[in-house]
Curated annotation (Swiss-Prot):
Alphabetical UniProt keywords: Membrane, Transmembrane, Transmembrane helix
Domain of life: Eukaryota
Transmembrane as UniProt keyword: yes
Native organism: Mus musculus (Mouse)
Gene Ontology cellular-component terms listed: membrane
Transmembrane region(s): 7-27
Keyword Transmembrane helix: yes
Main localization (coarse): membrane
Membrane-topology annotation of the record: Single-pass membrane protein
Protein name as it appears in the record: Small integral membrane protein 35
Cell compartment(s), UniProt: Membrane
Length: 85
């Protein structure tokens, strides 16, 4: 019968739509759960644009390193401190 085919097609469309809605809600909840830190200690879920800007300033800056700088009186390398890291 023609009526049975349209009912099964409508049921299939509703089933797929509700399944996609359920999967998207579950994925959003999992992402929020991860962002709050309940899963494990990891990086931020959303990449921070301020970190990118700070890294760019570090790369473009003058010839400095993390452990020292180049402006000693004799022109060589001078440490900031002698402490162990």
């Amino acid at each position: 019968m023609a009526g049975d085919d349209s009912i099964s097609t409508l049921g299939m469309i509703l089933g797929v739509g509700l399944s996609l809605l359920l999967v998207s809600i579950l994925g959003y909840s999992l992402a929020k759960w991860y962002q709050r830190g309940y899963c494990w200690d990891g990086p931020n879920f959303v990449f921070n644009l301020y970190q990118i800007r700070n890294l760019k300033d570090l790369e473009v800056g003058p010839p400095f390193t993390i452990s020292g700088h180049m402006s000693s009186p004799d022109g060589g390398y001078m440490k900031f401190s002698n402490d162990r890291v």
